[in-house]
Amino acid sequence: MKFKEEKKELKEIITAFERDYDVYKNKNSLFNEQMTRQQYIDRFLRLLGWDISNPRNLSFNNREIVAEEYSNSSDRPDYTIRMNGSSLFYVEAKKVSVNIESEIDPAMQVRRYGWNGGHKISVLTNFEYLAIYTTFHQPKEDDKVAYNRYKIYSYKEFVEKFDEIYELLSRESVLNGYFNEWTNNITPVNATKLSLDQVFLDQLNEWRLLVAKDLVASSVSEFQDSSTLNESVQSFLNQLIFLRFIEDNRFEGTEQLKNKINKHTDYQSYFKSLDKKYNSGIFENPDVILNMNGKTLKIIVESLYFPNASYDFSVIDLSILSRIYENFLQEEIVFDNKYIVKLEKTKSAKIKAVVSTPDSIVKLMVQRTLGEKIEGLSPDQIMDLKIGDLAVGSGIFLIEAYNYLENYLVDWYSTKEGVVATPYSVPFKVKKTIVQKVFRGFDINNQAVQLTKFSLLLRLLSYEDKERIIEISPLLPSLEDTIICGNSLVDERDVDITTMSYEESEDIVPMVNQVFDTIKFDVIIGNPPYLQTKEIIESTSNIEINVYKTKYSSVYKQYDKYFMFIERALELIKKDGITILLVPNKFFTVGAAMKLREFITKKYGLTFIIDFKTTQVFHGVINYVAIVQFGNYSDKTFQYSVAVSVDSAFEIENGLIYDMTKLETSHWFLTQDIKLRNQYEFAMEHFPNIETAVVPVNGIQTSANNVFLIEKKYIVEETKENIIFEVNKKKRIERFSIEKSLLKDFYQTPPKVQGRSYMPLIANKYVIFPYKNGKIIDYNTMEDKYPNTLEYFTNHKQDILPKVMGGKRDVQYCVEWYQYGRTQFLKESNVDKIIVGVMTNQPNFNIDRKRMLIASGGTAGYIALMKKEDSPYSLEYIQAWLSHSFTDMIFQTIGSSFEGDFYTHGTSMYEDIPLLPIDFSDSYQKEKYDKIVSCVKKIEEINQQIESGLNSKELKFREKQKNAHISNINEIFDELIQFKVENKSE
């Protein structure tokens, strides 16, 4: 029987419970919550796999269940269930005499905990009952006790329904993924709109407009400056949230802020006393509150309290608050006219929205790095560390780094003093010193800098007790010299301050020289901005871009901004320092990152890579990323692993070991498959690369496909000289004629049709090709010989007119207004070639004997492989080799990966693709070669038969026949590869 031992023990617990049930239920019973937890709830949780006694001796960082001390009077959940450092749900305990099945207060309390914690469920129990509540919805004053109650079990059902309870709440359920599955299933689609994140963000945005309107209407001229206005409003909101935070954490009296507002306190004196007590600059400036309408102030303050809101700032995780503020910073207050304000996306957000780094990723990165760095260190040694984030944003990485250090010190002090491990084990002065001395954060956005300071100070006070810190003055440290507004990529010495305008200075925000001159980091951690070259040009001044080009070797071709952050971070770490970043994984392979790869391999090092490949880790945004740990090491080896989920990444201990000296700069060939890696290294050492036989080229680029391409289905008439087609233009049909001699077949698979090797190539479109021998046909010749086409072009002149002639189209080397945007692939179309699908999820190499045109564009479209005249290898052999599974695995490894298991086959990759060589003087190899070529030709014949039209039975037979030939080809290649390995062919 499943759970036989667990059910046996549970029966014993229930028998003991029933024996004294009447005593427990008495309202005057001395059997309190502590006893209920110790005798019943702790034991029940243990049967579900959650053991608060920590039998595996996990560090405080890694504990999976954290219980509040029985004697602790703080208003926090009794149990926090965690996995990989992230809290999953709370369990709130009550003494047996509390009727949790019918009393509203316990239900409201546990729902508030869950909602403020960002959880999907919370559990309430007095052992007599166990109730599961959904917590995606903010509790309201008039809610009934059963509202959002998903399940409730009586203790009399515990044994009978143990399997069900175990499936829902056990440690095993969390580990095997079922917990996530069932909680996701019961959470409504619109839950994000009801979550703390969205509700609080909406209120912050509402409040900041209310405050801004008051300030603009005041007589203070400074508030007419949008930058000052935004910073002042944020500072004021920080003040209010800080006050609510210290109330809920019992450093100040309950509802003190509300009472002060209702009494119309002397705010200047009030803020002065707060500033003296807490220091840190939070209450330094009372200007906003002094210039606000009292009605506005009252509206905002009352919105922070129940029943108007269910906020509990003792429970809200700072990672959630950081995430909310990160979204808050995506918009700014702007003037619609002199006295009217509105919210608008910031300049950078308009170009590319910032997406919060998932908490679990942050925890993983901190754990992987600090776990190694601080092992065995004393508090004094930890206080000598320097940990930095060069693009600090909301401060989430520094907050989590602090969490990790504090939890490490909890273990250190509790072990030293022989006491139970709790956050109170660490002296507050030590915590304060760590926040002030260890962390450094930098950001170009001053509001982000202020937010990080604010978050660190809140974290310092979290899990603290008023009595422990009552004698400390000033209570909080100043972070003015450690969390700094400045450009991590540009120092003052990089620009000429004397010639810059104020606006340029505000835009660039060059870092003060002394900041980085006087510090080297033990650890740099973060998620730097991802901005492509095009986005950098749109958002960055020419002065700053010129600094990039002269200062950073990684600025090459279509570079990305994170390239420079990698380079900068590596320059700023100590000899034994570590840099760990979450960055797009395409820098392993793309051509634009070649200089960055050179920089890393020649000057620095790698420790490990956790590659998420196509697994998406960000919410609502597609990014292909990896966690990369860099270091300035003499050891030239690193470990490479692939993670299929964030949870699985926590389980990774060792990856495949690579030697950095063997990495090519053109691409890094990284795989977990040691057999594939060994085969590839052998092939690259003993085989020629395929560019000895073919030349990869891009297809045409018209820069106006809507004009130059004609779908054949729109052709309504055809003569010996012309085609006539119709187009629907602005709700009317227009008819045009094009000379056939200017038309070429254009190959492009229809939408949702996935190309593959050995398929017939069918052109469903024509492309107008106004060229002869690679040169544009001049206007007079067009007028004389191709008047129909010229008339068509003239009719669409506004669509194809080049920029240099007053139009919109990007055209290089402009001679005639109707030429293509680029001059590529104008001559190559006159010979047989292999057409390659650039973005596919399987081999897609096909011989084109119809001399069709193709189009290329980034990671889309097609390229062509042109056979070199002096190559002894036929197109048939090359097609077959490129379609073989070994070659396909190489493309999958060095190509950029995308969702749906798609990967690229662009022109830059072929120098790293080996070609299986044939010694034509060896009869064995020549025979194998001829068989491969013969099979490919037979496949082409079958494709021609399929094109001509077959009945379903014969079509099925021919497809079967084709597959047999493909299998024969692959078997022959397998034999040839084995032959080469055994004979160590050069």
Where are these regions (language model features)?
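Polynucleotide-recognition surfaces of large bacterial nucleic-acid defense/processing enzymes
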Residues: 276-277, 281-283, 455, 482-483, ...
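Short, basic/polar, glycine-containing "phosphate-handling" surface segments that engage DNA
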Residues: 1-24, 70-73, 83-87, 93-244, ...
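Charged, terminal alpha-helix-loop-beta segments
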Residues: 1-74
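SAM-dependent methyltransferase catalytic region
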Residues: 30, 36-37, 45, 53-55, ...
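Non-catalytic DNA-recognition/assembly elements of restriction-modification systems
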Residues: 392, 684, 689-691, 788, ...
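Class I S-adenosyl-L-methionine
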Residues: 201, 286-377, 807, 897
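Extended, well-ordered alpha-helical scaffold/bundle regions in very large, multi-domain proteins
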Residues: 240, 244-288, 388-394, 398-401
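Polybasic, glycine- and aromatic-enriched phosphate-binding surface used to engage nucleic acids
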Residues: 95, 102, 121, 563, ...
